[in-house]
């Protein structure tokens, strides 16, 4: 049930048409989760400042039940930053990604919890 949320000040018109599908595939791959459980949400056109500048930037959160752990987050970070830089043109030094490991009992789905 990975959820990747990205807040960015880039315009919606600058997001490639395949961004959601390619990001979903990447998240499923790096976390070894089925694509049918992956959710991706991008909030564009945000009023956002990074380092005192409003040049292109982003703040993201990757949440998952499992797969998020200190020994793997550096690799997750490298792959996500490469992807976001390539797809959206945001410099790697103008993004933060917060990794959150969730307990299945704290996540609702289909009328129950995991």
Swiss-Prot record:
It is an enzyme of class 5 (isomerase). Keywords: Cytokine, Isomerase, Secreted. Substrate binds at residues 33, 65. It is found in: Secreted. It catalyses: L-dopachrome = 5,6-dihydroxyindole-2-carboxylate; 3-phenylpyruvate = enol-phenylpyruvate. It comes from the Eukaryota. One of its GO terms (cellular component) is extracellular space. Tautomerization of the methyl ester of L-dopachrome. Inhibits migration of human peripheral blood mononuclear cells. Belongs to the MIF family. PANTHER family: D-DOPACHROME DECARBOXYLASE (PTHR11954), MACROPHAGE MIGRATION INHIBITORY FACTOR (PTHR11954:SF6). This is Macrophage migration inhibitory factor homolog. It comes from Trichinella spiralis.
